A protein has these predicted regions:
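C-terminal helical cap/extension that packs against the catalytic core
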Residues: 199, 203-221, 230-235, 266, ...
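Charged, amphipathic alpha-helical linker segments immediately N-terminal to NTP-binding catalytic cores
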Residues: 1-27
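ATP-dependent carboxylate-amine ligase catalytic core
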Residues: 12, 26-28, 32-49, 73-159, ...
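Membrane-proximal helix-turn-helix segments that form the acceptor-binding/catalytic region
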Residues: 185-193
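Nucleotide phosphate-binding/pyrophosphate-handling subdomain across enzymes
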Residues: 48-50, 137, 142-147, 154-165, ...
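A conserved segment at the C-terminal end of the G1
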Residues: 50-54, 62-79
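Extended acidic/charged loop-beta regions that coordinate divalent cations
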Residues: 88, 127-176, 207-244
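Beta-strand->loop->alpha-helix junctions that form or flank phosphate-binding loops
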Residues: 81-84, 200-202, 214-231, 248-252, ...
């Protein structure tokens, strides 16, 4: 049912989100013309004096979180826009590391609704404009924008980044971004700007990224060429044209993303002390990214949902001391590379607890089992989680993975039970 009545600034956030979901004829409608027009009317095309924009198949969230952590340690006032959220919509906008109240979001939506006139906006475009408006109100020093999909035609690209970052390139969203790494690389490099640093964390960079950098006159800085890092069992070293940083603490986020964030920061020209770098890297953490929630049994949340992320997750699982079995609670979207993702995880998982995800994009438990050959199917993520936890012994590991939605469902179940729900 389409909701025609426009919510007001004082309307609940849930009412606004329901309205936004039904506002535009298409869920994804790549292109910058509509959203740029509304942004100009709102005066949010320059949300802060300095902007980082971060694209990439995987690693965007933790790269943004590391940048945020270091910049805050250095005393900057920082805003971060990221997506999707895990449990609450308000997770998408952080100012000084904190979510804003729902009333701030609804106030921003009312401003956008007033400014857009007859211009139709997607849910993501609306959310992006909202973040930019909130950042402008907060009078920040630095804003970090996480690209939603691709780069060139993503709503975040209406803002000219002072530093553009591409974390990694792998096959995902091929319906929108193209069938191969070269096409995807070209789309993601669309965030590059003339005479501005363009940081690439992907070690096997598609040539199209260099092509776009040359076309735009961007200052390309590639991992393994202009900057690099090396890791030992107990610390890591980073080097670039500015020099070498040694004895860095191993990060809690994936190592390549911490290094990419550091490369972007050092290319930015922003003044940041070595102590702030060390403190920021040590404290950066992001929920749902190899998040060890508890022990006995060990419970790990990871939103890995494509082969590239599953390969990394598999490596992390193999590095853990293993005593018992690994029980995986998994739900996926059917438009992801299910076979490729599961092929990696099979080598570290002993028992599968498969669950369907809701909505038109959700894969059924049976679709997952087709690729696994063995495992149990359940009617919901909550049921799969309960069964895995009931079966797990103290020495076992329960891994929740496959999608943001899967991890979010389990987080919601845990939160509800903690607060006295069922």
């Amino acid at each position: 049912m389409i909701i025609k009545r426009t919510p007001q600034a004082a309307s609940p956030l849930a009412s606004w989100l329901s309205y936004l979901e039904n506002l535009h004829s298409k869920t994804i409608d790549l292109g910058l013309e509509r959203v740029s027009q509304v942004a100009a009317r709102l005066g949010v095309l320059k949300p802060a004096p300095f902007v980082f924009t971060v694209a990439g198949t995987n690693g965007k969230g933790t790269t943004c979180r590391t940048l945020e952590s270091i910049l805050m340690a250095a005393g900057y006032k920082v805003g971060v826009y990221s997506s999707p959220h895990l449990v609450r919509y308000t997770e998408r906008v952080r100012v000084q590391g904190q979510e804003l109240p729902e009333s701030a979001h609804t106030a921003s939506f009312a401003e956008i609704e007033s400014a857009r006139g007859d211009i139709s906006l997607t849910y993501f475009e609306y959310g992006t404009l909202s973040a930019l408006w909130l950042f402008k109100q907060a009078q920040l020093d630095v804003v970090i924008l996480e690209v939603g999909l691709g780069g060139r035609l993503d709503a975040t690209n209406i803002v000219d980044a002072d530093v553009a970052v591409v974390t990694s390139i792998a096959l995902d969203h091929t319906d929108w971004l193209g069938p191969d790494r070269e096409s995807i690389g070209r789309e993601k490099a669309g965030i590059f700007r003339s005479e501005k640093p363009a940081i690439v964390g992907e070690p096997e960079m598609p040539s199209t990224i260099a092509d776009v950098a040359q076309e735009k006159g961007a200052l390309l800085q590639r991992r393994g060429v202009e900057w690099n890092y090396s890791v030992t069992d107990h610390d890591w070293t980073f080097s670039d044209a500015h020099g070498t940083l040694e004895n860095l603490l191993l990060p809690l986020v994936p190592q390549p993303n911490a290094a990419t964030a550091l490369a972007a920061l050092r290319a930015s020209g922003l003044e940041v002390s070595e102590n702030a770098i060390r403190d920021g890297i040590a404290s950066a953490i992001l929920p749902g990214r190899f998040q060890i929630v508890s022990e006995s049994p060990r419970v790990i949340f990871d939103v890995a949902h494509n082969p590239h992320a599953a390969e990394y997750l598999t490596g992390r699982m193999k590095a853990l001391p293993k005593n018992g079995r690994v029980l995986a609670v998994i739900g996926m979207l059917h438009d992801k590379d299910i076979a490729g993702t599961l092929a990696w995880l099979k080598s570290v998982v002993d028992d599968w607890y498969c669950a369907p995800l809701e909505g038109p994009r959700g894969a059924t438990a049976e679709q997952l089992l087709e690729h696994l050959g063995n495992g149990k199917s359940f009617d919901s993520v909550a049921q799969a989680w309960d069964a895995a936890m009931a079966d797990a012994k103290a020495e076992d590991t329960v891994l929740v993975c496959g999608s943001f939605h899967t991890v979010a469902h389990v987080m919601e179940v845990i939160d509800a039970r903690r607060s006295g729900g069922k």
